[in-house]
Amino acid sequence: MRLIIIGAVAAGTSAAAKARRNDEALEIVIYEKDTYISYSGCGMPYYLGGEVDAAEELTPRDPAFFKSKYNVDIHTQHEVVSINPELKILEVKDLVTDTVFTDHYDRLILATGASSVIPPIKGVNSENVFTLRNINDMNRIKNYIDQQKPKKAAIIGTGFIGLEVCENLKRLGIDVTLIERLPQVTPGLDQDMALYVLDHLQKNGIKVYLGASATEITGNSVILSDGTTIEAEFILFSTGVRPNITLAKQAGIEIGTTGAIKVDHSMKTNLSDIYACGDCIEHYHVVTGKPVYRPLGSTANKTGRIAGDCITGGTLSFRGILGTGIFRVFELTVAQTGLSEREAKEQDYEVAVCHNIKPNKPEYLGGKEMVIKAIADRQTGRLLGVQIVGYEGVDKRIDVFVTAVSFGAKVEDLFHLDLAYAPPFSTTKDPVMYTGMILDNAIHHGRDLMTAEELDQLMKSGENYVLIDARAASQFDNAHIETAGNIPHSKLRSAVGELDPEVIAVTYCNKGVTGNAAQNILINNGVKKVYNLSGGHKHYSKLDKFNN
């Protein structure tokens, strides 16, 4: 049997390797239109900034390696230009000789990947305008920086790649400006969490323009939709990718609602003996069960392995994704998984939201705070999604949350996890456990939370309420929320009789713990509706800083 794979980066080579492990007699051929194969695309920003010493470290395998180890024939600079699914014939163009020939397959895998989206604006074809999608892109950028030595750069788009390149250009001493058409950076995050990223960028000397689109590139400048001109000798578009589906559409392969190739759990398309995997396919979301398009290298490798297994008689089955992502920008780690608050509400979940600010380990051993935002279904208690920003231990916590969401855990389950503890590694109540405690109290034990946005709405509503700052008087005097009164936690029991039990009460402290203690006192003394401010004054002041 002859298996042909179109594409030799993450998914295609993963499919080939798994197919060979399952079947030694199978003939495996891969056509790849690029010159590089099986490379680490996610490492490219770090080569540009010098963290990766040599480009060869990102391209450790060549066609000779796959021939020797897996007996797979990889033909680079060969583009498949058409598929005849009835005759099982491909037309292939040799990009070096410009000749076209045909090849026959018994089984076919499309691993055609995705391409950078570039807005159709004037000047995008200028020599100083780049995208970063493959090794050739990376080499062009590196050569340009080495030769032209730009002093100013503009990056259009603030997704993972854009921010990673931003950091690495800044390390080279280049002045960087970020341009984002949305009103926040990192569009995958909720806006309140994105503000932590924005604040960190600005503290590291990055200029950020939000709600602004590039409309024209003229020489060494970018013109924005409001007429602002940004000087930049180097310009990078990091405005997302779209799946490469031209071949699939021409062959009659079904395209899903997300615009990517529709596949089943074994990576089969609607056409007999044709499979697809990697960044060209749509996935489905573990929480909602609905189609999503989230191209990631980890998912590409996974779906490639599944395709290679199923095409050779295996039983691997795709179980969906959560859209888990993580990146670093100037020592800050940002991670997310599952549904954001915005996405959960769009799916009509009644959500409970908490902001848990805790160190990754005891402060006496140098622990550093992280902010964990967790979203749960108020009706069932199921954990729906988590976002984290912090300096240490973020990767460890997000992976625990990923596991929990993947297996349908409820918030109370987090408290019962037997997580590893010793002071060099964690606190006695790990931030994961504490997140579960907060949400369990909110959903099942009447300790309701109020987000900063909800408090702002309450303050503007005209409804009668009392806002209690339960911190010490010195902390209150230093900074407090505008309409708050100060009743320190130590004095609240004696003062509770002066409060109207029918009036909404909102408590807060610095991060939430003492606010919760104050909430308990009020509830246990008959105040009927009491909320604790999620994330306390520390989180509220972050939002207030940017809103004002």
State the predicted function of each range:
Residues 1, 21, 280-392, 426-427, ...:
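Mid-to-C-terminal Rossmann-like scaffold of FAD/NAD(P)H-dependent oxidoreductases
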Residues 1-73, 77, 166-189, 324, ...:
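Beta1-alpha1 glycine-rich phosphate/pyrophosphate-binding loop at the start
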Residues 25-27, 75-96, 103, 170-263, ...:
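A Rossmann-like FAD-binding core segment of flavoenzymes
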Residues 59, 152-154, 160-216, 295-299, ...:
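Rossmann-like dinucleotide-binding cores of NAD(P)H-dependent redox enzymes
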Residues 104-113, 232-240, 304, 381:
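Short hydrophobic core segments
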Residues 110-172, 207, 263-265, 487-491, ...:
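Glycine-rich dinucleotide-binding loop and its adjacent helix/turn
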Residues 125-149, 220-223, 229-306, 400, ...:
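FAD-site-proximal beta/loop scaffold in flavoenzymes
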Residues 412-466, 473-506, 510-548:
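Rhodanese-like catalytic fold shared by cysteine-dependent sulfurtransferases
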